[in-house]
Swiss-Prot record:
Places the protein is found: Cytoplasm
GO terms assigned for molecular function: chorismate lyase activity
Binding site for substrate: 80, 118, 170
Described function: Removes the pyruvyl group from chorismate, with concomitant aromatization of the ring, to provide 4-hydroxybenzoate (4HB) for the ubiquinone pathway.
Organism encoding this protein: Pseudomonas entomophila (strain L48)
Protein name: Probable chorismate pyruvate-lyase 2
One Pfam family named in its UniProt record: Chor_lyase
Reactions catalysed according to its record: chorismate = 4-hydroxybenzoate + pyruvate
GO biological process: pyruvate biosynthetic process; ubiquinone biosynthetic process
Organism domain of life: Bacteria
Enzyme Commission number(s): 4.1.3.40
Length: 185
């Protein structure tokens, strides 16, 4: 995967209100569930959940990420990309970012997460405030080659704690939709 993620044409991240009448209920439920995705995936996989880190490091953030975090375009930040897996299959591609300047003074050490879920950390720390979820058709060029499909739904939200902002994006891969469908049978 290119680790300077390419910029894409303007991506429209939309709130629930703009998608509520155009998407089916199961898709909306996954995109706009405000609970812990890690916990939901753990339940769906019957505790066969794991995190596979793909990339962690400093790089220029994408323009849409800078805008969401209130940073100058092209500002450098910490980027963490992982697969959230169920039964060893990639179910979700997740990309979490934070600006360098706020992360260095924010008291959160993302470099030591390894195979632990960032979501679990965010939901266990009551000081984090989650801002509203937004969803879009995630650009194929932003995905790892192995899972790059056109038209996949992704969501993102900003988590804030005492001036520290993290942006977490999660893209729902075909294997997740299949597992969710089988679970409802």
């Amino acid at each position: 995967m290119p680790y300077e993620t390419p910029q894409a044409a303007a991506v429209a991240w939309l709130p629930y209100s703009q998608l509520a009448t155009t998407l089916d209920q199961p898709t909306l439920d996954w995109l706009f569930d405000e609970g812990s995705l890690t916990r939901r995936l753990t339940r769906l996989s019957h505790d066969h959940f794991s995190v596979t880190p793909l990339f962690e490091g400093w790089q220029p953030l994408r323009d849409d990420e800078c805008a969401a975090l209130g940073l100058a375009p092209g500002e450098e930040g910490w980027v963490r990309e992982v697969y959230l897996r169920g039964h060893d299959q990639p179910w979700v591609f997740a990309r979490s970012v934070a600006g360098r300047s706020v992360l260095e003074r924010g008291g959160l050490d993302l470099e030591t997460l390894g195979t632990r879920s960032l979501g679990e950390l965010l939901f266990c720390d009551q000081a984090f405030i989650r801002h509203p979820l937004e969803a879009c058709r995630y650009p194929q060029t932003w995905l790892p080659t192995k899972v790059a499909h056109e038209g996949l739904w992704g969501r993102r939200s900003r988590f804030e704690r005492s001036g520290l902002d993290l942006l977490v994006a999660e893209v729902f891969l075909p294997a997740l939709w299949q597992a969710a469908k089988e679970e409802t049978r």
